[in-house]
């Protein structure tokens, strides 16, 4: 199958940080559209930092549910993400047995 268009791998992180998040299917999740264009697309480091700040403020643990999208496609382009993902998780001690990651 051949796909055309723009993909994350076509951009640098600096370029991606200029974009704002939008609801992908507004016809089904209309309530989410109130947040359109309000937030940057976060990096994993930023999400982990946000979870840590929430814990410090409230004492409530926020778990991470990560999903890599189309990893074989990225591998074919020599952009495998698994090692980088594992290094990032390890940096924040999410490699422990009790880490709230799913």
What does each of the following model-derived ranges do?
Residues 1-102:
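Metal-dependent phosphodiesterase/phospholipase catalytic core, i.e.
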């Amino acid at each position: 199958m051949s796909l055309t268009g723009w993909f994350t791998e076509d951009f640098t992180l600096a370029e991606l940080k200029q974009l704002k998040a939008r609801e992908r299917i507004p016809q089904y999740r209309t309530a989410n559209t109130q947040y359109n264009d309000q937030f940057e697309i976060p990096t994993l480091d930023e999400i982990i930092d946000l979870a840590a700040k929430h814990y410090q403020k409230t004492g409530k643990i926020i778990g991470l549910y990560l999903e890599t999208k189309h990893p074989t496609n990225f591998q074919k382009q020599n952009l495998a993400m698994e090692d980088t993902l594992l290094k990032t998780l390890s940096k924040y001690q999410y490699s422990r047995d009790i880490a709230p990651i799913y």
